[in-house]
């Protein structure tokens, strides 16, 4: 009795889907959890580190801005070429760049050297995940799953990484508090950057365990095999895969010693493929609308991040730093727990409905944060908002994966990440201006309004977009295989028939001559 019950619970929570996806999913989730755990190190100590080196505040501001800009541009570039260069190579190279930045910060105290390492390397200045990792990882997970398991696996991806970020922020905060009591603070900060570099090395080692299934071509190959092409069609399948896929077959090495293909199967000449992902017109028509809505939502998130909400609560109610830390930890914990249920909910009411019906109450709560006159109700609204705030993340990624062709998925997710980051970076400046004029409450009202516009826009524009059993972009792409490939295969079959027909004719003629 206990086994069926546990099996049902595992199926409901998406654990069965996660196990079915395999080792690659575990490695991807571990990679991002590791990064989220370590992202708190630079975000907490960078300003303190620069202050200990007597850098001017204006230089620190320039450093943060240029680092964010460099991260956006580098991330966009790497995600656009990830499918061609190899997704595993991008993840491996990004981990090495993360380690490189940590080593430079551990060894150098020169402002310009540190700036170059931050702009051209990967280091988090906001406490959030940075670099090209998330877009590539979400693309990989989307390719490893199908429409039935995707939302479950992505929900666990969000859950584990959010929890790791919460634990990492708590650990980093306590470590920094301990280090502040030491006399040689600079050396202590250098030691933390060595730890940051070490986590980058660990991440690069984990990348070596990823299989070929993570690549765009490996994803296509698995998909073709699942479509049931028989044993005699192996050679044709190989031709079609090479014709259809502009990507590498794997991220680290090229297969050698592959058996020679039959000479009588002609492979049509392929056009030279660009290293950059090509976003088709059909994809752009959907993503343009979604990008505009996501920019509005990200602007709202940037106006009232956790740091500014804590500042508002501290200024209004004069609570202790420990209380603020407890509120933040509780909020992140609720985000992580609630994300578990996003997958099961999406399978029952749909991706868009899950995004809207969970995010809309959170959006309304954001606008009501300034209303309470006491700290208790304010904290209650903050926690209610946090409990529903992240439930749209996994369904959103699953929706993008469903409406975008597989070969365009990584590039589309990279552009999505760039749009969100740029829009989010504008928010704190707006809130700063409002706070300076004693109108902080307007920032919360504007946040709620923008988020409600995002939610209603999602529902109006996308609620009727079917992503279930209809022939989506993926199947359209598979069913519309390059005509030249089919023509080449058909003409080969015709030629084989002609050759056999001519052979029969010559034998008949020879038999007739012998009879005569």
Model region roles, listed by residue range:
Residues 89-104, 353-368:
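Structural signature of the two symmetry-related core transmembrane helices
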Residues 2-22, 217-298, 315, 481-484:
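Juxtamembrane intracellular "pre-TM" segments in multi-pass secondary transporters
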Residues 187-209, 442-460:
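Symmetry-related core transmembrane helices of the 12-TM Major Facilitator Superfamily/SLC fold
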Residues 123-145, 391-404:
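Intracellular juxtamembrane helix-capping segments at the cytosolic ends
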């Amino acid at each position: 009795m206990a086994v069926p019950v546990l099996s049902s619970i595992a199926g409901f929570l998406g654990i069965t889907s996660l196990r079915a996806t395999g080792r690659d999913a575990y490695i991807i989730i571990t990679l991002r959890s590791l990064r989220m755990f370590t992202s708190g190190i630079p975000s907490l100590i960078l300003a303190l580190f620069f202050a200990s080196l007597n850098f001017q505040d204006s230089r620190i501001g320039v450093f943060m801005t240029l680092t964010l800009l460099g991260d956006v541009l580098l991330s966009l570039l790497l995600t656009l070429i990830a499918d061609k260069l190899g997704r595993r190579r991008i993840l491996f190279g990004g981990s090495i760049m993360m380690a490189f930045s940590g080593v430079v910060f551990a060894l150098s105290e020169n402002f310009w050297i540190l700036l170059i390492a931050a702009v051209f390397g990967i280091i988090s200045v906001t406490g959030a995940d940075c670099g090209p990792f998330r877009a590539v990882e979400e693309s990989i997970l989307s390719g490893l799953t199908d429409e039935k398991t995707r939302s479950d696996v992505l929900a666990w991806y969000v859950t584990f990484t959010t929890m790791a970020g919460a634990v990492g922020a708590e650990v980093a905060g306590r470590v920094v508090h301990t280090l502040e009591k030491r006399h040689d603070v600079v050396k202590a900060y250098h030691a933390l950057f060595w730890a940051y570099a070490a986590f980058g090395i660990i991440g690069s080692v984990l990348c070596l365990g990823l299989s070929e299934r993570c690549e765009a071509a490996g994803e296509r190959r698995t998909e073709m095999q699942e479509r049931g092409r028989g044993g005699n069609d192996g050679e044709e399948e190989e031709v079609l895969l090479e014709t259809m896929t502009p990507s590498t077959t794997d991220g680290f090495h090229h297969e050698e010693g592959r058996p020679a293909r039959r000479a009588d199967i002609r492979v049509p000449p392929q056009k030279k493929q660009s290293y950059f992902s090509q976003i088709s017109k059909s994809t752009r028509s959907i993503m343009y609308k979604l990008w505009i809505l996501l920019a509005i939502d990200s602007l709202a998130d940037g106006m009232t991040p956790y740091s500014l909400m804590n500042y508002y609560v501290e200024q209004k109610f004069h609570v202790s730093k420990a209380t603020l830390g407890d509120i933040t930890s509780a909020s992140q914990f609720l985000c992580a727990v609630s994300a578990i249920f996003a997958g099961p909910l999406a399978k029952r009411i749909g991706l868009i409905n899950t995004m809207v019906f969970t995010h809309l109450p959170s959006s309304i709560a954001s606008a009501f944060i300034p209303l309470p006159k006491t700290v208790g109700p304010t904290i209650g609204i903050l926690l209610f908002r946090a409990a529903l705030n992240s439930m749209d993340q996994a369904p959103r990624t699953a929706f993008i994966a469903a409406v975008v062709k597989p070969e365009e998925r990584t590039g589309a997710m990279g552009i999505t990440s760039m749009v969100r980051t740029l829009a989010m970076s504008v928010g704190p400046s707006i809130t700063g201006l409002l706070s300076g004029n004693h109108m902080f409450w307007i920032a919360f009202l504007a946040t709620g309004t923008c988020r409600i516009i995002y939610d209603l826009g999602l529902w109006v524009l996308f609620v009727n977009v079917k992503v279930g059993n209809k022939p989506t972009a993926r199947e359209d792409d598979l069913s519309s295989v390059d005509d030249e490939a089919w023509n080449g295969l058909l003409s080969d079959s015709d030629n084989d028939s002609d050759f056999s027909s001519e052979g029969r004719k010559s034998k008949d003629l020879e038999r007739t001559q012998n009879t005569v």
